[in-house]
C-alpha cells in the first residue's frame, strides 16, 4: 500500500470504529460495540476463573485494545486509539487473580526488536 492509501485506510478505520462505538452504524453489524465489549469482558472473566494458571491468549488488535481499555477503566475512544497502535505479533502481559486484572506491558515486540527483523514489524 502506498503511504497515502495507508493513511487513508487508518483514517477510515478510525472513523468506522468511532461510529461503531457510538452505535451510529446503520444497517446490520455482526455485533454491537456493547456486545463486543461484553464478549471481551466475558473472556477476561473466564481467564480470571482459571485458578491462577498461566494463560496464553492469541487475538487480534480489537480485543487486545479493548482488554487494555477495560482494565484501565478508560473511555471507548481509548480502545480505538490503542487498536490503531497494536503491532502485529506484539505481546501484552497482565497480572491477574480472582480479584484483580492489571496491565503489566502493552504492545511489546522484543522478539522482533533486532535489526534483521525490523521489516517484520507491521501494524494491523
Predicted features and spans:
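Phosphate-handling substructures
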Residues: 1-39
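Acidic, low-complexity terminal tails and accessory targeting/binding regions
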Residues: 1-7, 34, 49-54, 69-124
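Generic structural signal for well-ordered alpha-helical scaffold segments
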Residues: 37, 41-48
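Short, well-ordered beta-to-alpha junction loops that form the rim of enzyme active sites
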Residues: 55-63
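A broad detector of the eukaryotic-type serine/threonine protein kinase catalytic domain
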Residues: 21-25, 45, 52, 76
Amino acid at each position: 500500500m502506498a503511504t497515502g492509501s495507508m493513511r487513508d485506510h487508518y483514517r477510515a478505520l478510525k472513523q468506522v470504529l468511532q461510529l461503531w462505538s457510538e452505535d451510529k452504524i446503520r444497517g446490520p453489524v455482526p455485533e454491537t460495540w456493547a456486545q463486543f465489549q461484553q464478549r471481551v469482558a466475558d473472556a477476561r472473566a473466564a481467564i480470571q476463573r482459571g485458578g491462577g494458571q498461566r494463560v496464553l491468549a492469541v487475538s487480534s488488535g480489537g480485543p487486545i485494545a479493548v482488554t487494555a481499555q477495560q482494565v484501565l477503566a478508560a473511555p471507548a475512544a481509548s480502545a480505538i486509539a490503542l487498536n490503531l497502535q497494536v503491532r502485529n505479533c506484539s505481546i501484552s502481559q497482565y497480572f491477574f487473580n480472582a480479584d484483580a486484572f492489571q496491565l503489566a506491558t502493552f504492545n511489546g515486540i522484543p522478539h522482533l526488536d533486532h535489526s534483521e527483523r525490523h521489516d517484520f514489524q507491521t501494524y494491523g
